Structure formats: C-alpha cells, structure tokens
A protein has these predicted regions:
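Helix N-cap motif at beta-to-alpha junctions
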Residues: 8-11, 46-51
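Short amphipathic alpha-helix segments
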Residues: 9-25
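Intrinsically disordered, low-complexity boundary segments flanking structured domains
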Residues: 13, 30-33, 55-58
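C-terminal structural segments of small proteins and small subunits
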Residues: 51-83
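Generic alpha-helical hydrophobic packing signal
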Residues: 16, 39-41, 59, 63-64
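Amphipathic, hydrophobic secondary-structure cores in small proteins
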Residues: 1, 26-46
Length: 83
C-alpha cells in the first residue's frame, strides 16, 4: 500500500473527490503515527504506485501540497519514496 500524506483532512478529501469516478479504491485515513509522529495529518491510501503518482500529479495541478509519499513495507513499517 502507498500513503500520500496531506496536512489536513480538507486537502486529502478534496483530492480524493477528484477521483470519485475512478475504479481504484482510494481511502482517506489518519496518517499512521510511524509516518507522522505526533502531528495530526491525513493520508490517501492506495494500492498501486502508479495510482499514487497520478494522485500526486493531480495534487500539484490543484496547488495542494503533499508532505510525502510512503510505501508500507511490512505491517506498520513504512519507507519514504521519492517521486
């Protein structure tokens, strides 16, 4: 799974809504604490790297900053991905 991290639920939900007619499953979640530490942020969770890149591109087009892209490597273990 891939996690695209946003600073607020407003940004995460806004971008998710741009993909509401997409067949891919996109979920808004609280960012796992192993990624966010103590900060309150939200992420879009997707299965494929390609879909994550598509979401990042849409975020950039709409002027919505992301805090990072992470790949879940094991249960509750994450690696930051350069995009």
């Amino acid at each position: 799974m891939y996690y695209i991290v946003y600073s607020s639920i407003t940004f995460a939900t806004g971008i998710k809504n741009k993909f509401r007619y997409d067949s891919a499953r996109i979920t808004v979640i609280h960012t796992p604490s192993k990624i966010s530490g103590a900060s309150c942020s939200y992420s879009l969770k997707v299965k494929s790297y390609e879909k994550a890149l598509e979401i990042i591109k849409a975020s950039e087009e709409y002027g919505v900053a992301i805090r990072g892209l992470y790949k879940e490597t094991a249960e509750n273990e994450f690696e930051e991905i350069t995009y």
